[in-house]
Amino acid sequence: MPSSAVAAGVAPRERSHTVRAFFFVTAPADPGLLSRLIEPVAKLGAVPSRVHASRESGDGSELSVELRLAGVAPRTAELVEFALRAVVGVRQVMALIEVEA
């Protein structure tokens, strides 16, 4: 049975909002890591609004990377999160995704 909105000839509301996504990644310091982290973002057609990387863990053996996206579809942010978790060498990914006003 069709919903009352469809029966009344009104189109259902589309999910047209965008989100901001913040990703915090830790991994062993490796020369190819940054390019492996940026690649899935580029493949999804997004451009990071910020990328910051620093060597941590006292001896510099660990890399901490902050990656931000703005104005992307919620599904794009979710796919980036999944892709970052699948990058070889990544130990941890923390993601914060919030709806833009």
Tell me the role of every PLM-derived stretch:
Residues P2-A101:
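A conserved regulatory-domain signal marking ACT and ACT-like small-molecule sensing domains
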